[in-house]
Amino acid sequence: IHNPSLFVYDGTYPYRGMLNTIKGRDEIGKIWVRRGTFRKGATRIPMDSIEHFDVIITPRDSLEEAKDDTQEIKAQVFDCEPIIYASEDDLNSRQHLRSRLGIPMDALVCYVQLGAGNINDIESDISITVSELAKYEDVYTVVGESMLGQSLEISGPRVRILKDYPNSVYFRSFDFAIIAGGYNSYHEVIRF
């Protein structure tokens, strides 16, 4: 039997089954890395979920909004910088990915990443995006394919597929990006 000493949940809202599993397990530490904050005046703050945790870590957002996280709770609350999966030292040169994918150094390069496609069908959105970008002869499109999703059926003379993780290590190669507004992608694009 596995007997963990620490449980860490990284997400927006804890699932009921998970909460039921950790409820009453006083022998383990319970940490919630709660991305996103509750807006001031929010009426749907999951107090019953918060009460299951000893520590709540709240990564700050790039845009500071008025928030009201001062609810009386028993958990310790810590703020930290936005969580990203690469550092400046990890970034490859502008030429690295362009050479690897056969993209001219003087081309405009757009990075497209619209999610894993596990929740929403993204293939048609990606097809439309790639078709629109193809109208510009000086633009190459690099589609970031999720490690979690199925392979995309996208091709074209100036289209490249990048299936790697984290793709943010290649951000110096791109001139602009079209991305899904997820926490990780947003903060990595803003940072790099």
Please tell me what each predicted stretch does:
Residues 25-30, 53-54, 74-75, 137-139:
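A short helix->loop->beta-strand "cap" motif at the edges of active sites that frequently abuts
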Residues 2-14:
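Short N-terminal targeting/anchoring amphipathic segment
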Residues 16, 40-42, 63-68, 119-121, ...:
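Short, charged/polar "capping" segments at the starts of alpha-helices
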Residues 92-176:
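Donor-nucleotide binding loops and adjacent catalytic segments primarily
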Residues 2-3, 52, 172-173:
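Alpha-helix C-terminal capping/helix-to-coil transition sites in glycosyltransferase folds
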Residues 34-42, 49-114:
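A nucleotide-sugar donor-handling region in carbohydrate enzymes
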Residues 9, 164-192:
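A donor-sugar binding/catalytic signature common to diverse glycosyltransferases
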Residues 48-51, 66-74, 148-158, 189:
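Short loop/helix-cap segments at secondary-structure boundaries that form the rim of catalytic
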